[in-house]
């Protein structure tokens, strides 16, 4: 059976194709459009689909839209519609509700009734728990937001997800980190990795104050809302300089987020007793925090979905639909499911661009020599 997964709601639009339980193709729209993150994460972009990625996935497998048994869209507008006090969510929800029609228009031959909404964090969880080598694992999803939550903790048993805890919005470790990213003069929903790096240059001297507002609650949840950052450091203007209070603030937030994540994972282990923890969600891209979880929790193994951000929900949506149909396949063997090119194709493009090149027999040895010569 053939399942196409789609992420389009926030940022990093992507598509993934699962055939008979196995991932056969996956790609982010940015690889075709050459626009970083595919689009900006605003409600008014929710109608934009990963059209090129979808078509490439189908072509890679030799399928047409009519061959699809179902399409999974990694956001459920019915849940999001219940969120109060967000003036922009109705726009996003309206576009999401119309996704079946948008998809049928983008993929002629697709029956719009085959489009199914998969809850955002369930898609994240599936991208980890259904793709990992172990069929028995705990799963931890932490990001900015889904429809109404910012966190999911659960466990997988032979493909079945049991949800043990969710953290409701507005508490969100991901949105906390995004807010700090913006305060430090970087692009939110894009440059969080720069904040993680900046943290290594600072001292966590604001940690005691931050612990008062960002902390685990002991029941699998947490409190985390962005404070007035000017209490700690003025807003940074991106003028190429950094350090001082800004680096210390980054270090402090990184430290408190790590502490909460360790507490969440430890609580989850107490509920499941599993050897293996699988992770997904944008916060799982914080490799420094992941290393803390691996070192400081009882889990013996930690498996992080390589596409932990929202692009991975396309993969998760497809895997979730396949699992529901009893099409549970093999673990994800690689992250390299995207487009590739042959050596001859690359050579032809270089000739067209009149770029000189060589094809050494001992490629690794020659590259090593160049690197050794500071090349």
Q: Where are the model-predicted features located?
A:
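Short acidic/glycine-rich loops and adjacent helix/strand connectors
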Residues: 1-375
